[in-house]
Amino acid sequence: MPTIKQLIRNTRQKIRNVTKSPALRGCPQRRGTCTRVYTITPKKPNSALRKVARVRLTSGFEITAYIPGIGHNLQEHSVVLVRGGRVKDLPGVRYHIVRGTLDAVGVKDRQQGRSKYGVKKPK
């Protein structure tokens, strides 16, 4: 417990909260351009080829973003919308691409959980 004299000399430090998605600069989403679209393997014990894209954001950051859902149409120079949210088994992937906006089309033949994959209600 500090004395009054010690508290006068140097005040208590405020606890700084560190953001988990710094590239978004406090915005809910950011627009960006794909510079590379590729697959990476998850860490143990999982095994797959996860689809990711390297994206240059309007905030100037170059990030790795996960492409959710089955199948996609993204390639180099595709304009995408990026939101926060990490992928637990992919180290360094802290962002998701929003499906159904800009150049990223929604998932084909999706029936359930459609809003998360940019799919309109089927007729």
Swiss-Prot record:
Family: Belongs to the universal ribosomal protein uS12 family.
Protein source organism: Dioscorea elephantipes (Elephant's foot yam)
Pfam families assigned: Ribosom_S12_S23 (PF00164)
Location of the protein in the cell: Plastid, Chloroplast
Keyword line: Chloroplast, Plastid, Ribonucleoprotein, Ribosomal protein, RNA-binding, rRNA-binding
Signal peptide: none
Top-level taxon in the UniProt lineage: Eukaryota
Primary residence: plastid
GO molecular function: rRNA binding; structural constituent of ribosome
HAMAP family registered for this protein in UniProt: Ribosomal_uS12_B
Function: With S4 and S5 plays an important role in translational accuracy. Located at the interface of the 30S and 50S subunits.
Protein name stated in the entry: Small ribosomal subunit protein uS12cz/uS12cy
Keyword rRNA-binding recorded: yes
GO cellular component, one term: small ribosomal subunit
GO biological process, one term: translation
CDD domains: Ribosomal_S12
The keyword Plastid appears for this protein: yes
Subunit description: Part of the 30S ribosomal subunit.
